């Protein structure tokens, strides 16, 4: 936001190592986080002529990673790092047959409206919801909804 940039510029008047802060916030990741990102990147699924990318984080993946659940925050943006992807979907298991969905849009698709169909919401380019069902059922619902949203946005 505008205010965040104003505040950041004021901090530069003090002897703050903003380059170090930036590096620690955006560039440095734990080995566990990098391993998880590597695994998720290699297992990413593509739908709708590669316009939709989906990663799935099961409880098994969380357990094997040794990471805390909070360390998975921000992983949703991984799906938008692929050229041509318009809708990125992260499906994270909360418990058996309960999934937290995070969606990101790279361009014109309103993922907030998409998530509202499942009782969620958010912003045009970042939104979320929760869907109950088997993993296959959840993925099918998401791909169908993403397809509709992409077609409507054209």
What residues fall within each predicted segment?
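Hydrophobic helix-and-loop "lid/oligomerization" segment in the mid-to-C-terminal part
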Residues: 1-117, 122-154
